[in-house]
Every structure is written in C-alpha cells, then in structure tokens.
Amino acid sequence: WXDGYFVEVIVRFNP
C-alpha cells in the first residue's frame, strides 16, 4: 500500500 492505504482500500471496494 501506499501512503494513503485507506484510500486504496476504498477504491478496491468501489465497483
């Protein structure tokens, strides 16, 4: 993950 791991997780769950 990058620095914004939270953002990456949200993108993964986004359709």
UniProtKB/Swiss-Prot annotation:
Subcellular location(s) per record: Mitochondrion
One Gene Ontology cellular component annotation held by this UniProt entry: mitochondrion
Keyword vocabulary terms for this entry: Mitochondrion, Ribonucleoprotein, Ribosomal protein
Domain of life: Eukaryota
Summary of the function given for this chain in its UniProt record: Putative component of the large subunit of mitochondrial ribosome.
Listed name of the protein: Putative large ribosomal subunit protein YmL12
Species this protein is from: Saccharomyces cerevisiae
